[in-house]
């Protein structure tokens, strides 16, 4: 696996974020750069092998931790104010500015997991994104959880998680083995009772106004990227309703959906998180690679437009104007 370089960069409000970059030694103006937006309370290092895979395919890649998570966690998480709004409008915005500065003029692409798809819609500079791939990206409401698991998930994520957060001032996910620790604001966003984010989103301790909500909706409609939303049939978090609820916000994008069943690739389960495990490098990762580099899916997977026309069949010839891969410096 290629060795990334550790880096730090400012979010839009100056908060220092930490991450890694996979860069090629020789610059090339047409080489795409991929920003990887993590899921809620998932460390950026979870995506390292996926990032190395995209790097080997000819991309520059940036991974990073949102504020309050992993390398971007403050010394004291109790009382630290951060939520999905900050992760999108400030942190992802900072990542876009960083790749624009570091790889000036190169095409910017996004690979987003779960809540990372919502972050795509909230950054003021999201119009810079030329193409996006999302995995299990949704604005989930508890009623959207898988029917057979809904009650257990409701107790876990909507009763126990907010109760522990209220007691401690943050969610101790790592201690429980559920996920990483998370700021209280993220828990508030996750456990909100309404199915639309603008109705329940919070911005730190600031009062959310109708003007802010209108601005968020405008920013979600701003990107003109080609967007592929991948869903997995055994994903208990991201059912069809949740996936399509988020997809509906991106009215300026050309949108496609791809739904995959584990049996299609000969495995018993995939779920919400396993896509980024390297055991799927030969079966699932080509979906992301081919979409980001070619704007189409491998022939064994059929995406459908949402709504509209079917995307073109993938040409197996190299993407036009792609640069030769090279080792990272150092």
Name every feature range the model reports, one short phrase each.
Residues 1-24:
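N-terminal cap/lid segment of alpha/beta-hydrolase-fold proteins
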Residues 39-42:
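Active-site glycine-rich loops that stabilize anionic/oxyanionic intermediates
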Residues 44-76:
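Conserved alpha/beta-hydrolase
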Residues 81-102:
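Alpha/beta-hydrolase active-site loop
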Residues 111-200:
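Alpha/beta-hydrolase-fold enzymes
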Residues 223, 229-231:
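Short beta-strand/loop motif that positions the catalytic acidic residue
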Residues 238-249:
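Short alpha-helix in the alpha/beta-hydrolase fold that links the catalytic acid
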Residues 260-329:
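Catalytic active-site module of serine/aspartate enzymes centered on a nucleophile-bearing elbow/loop
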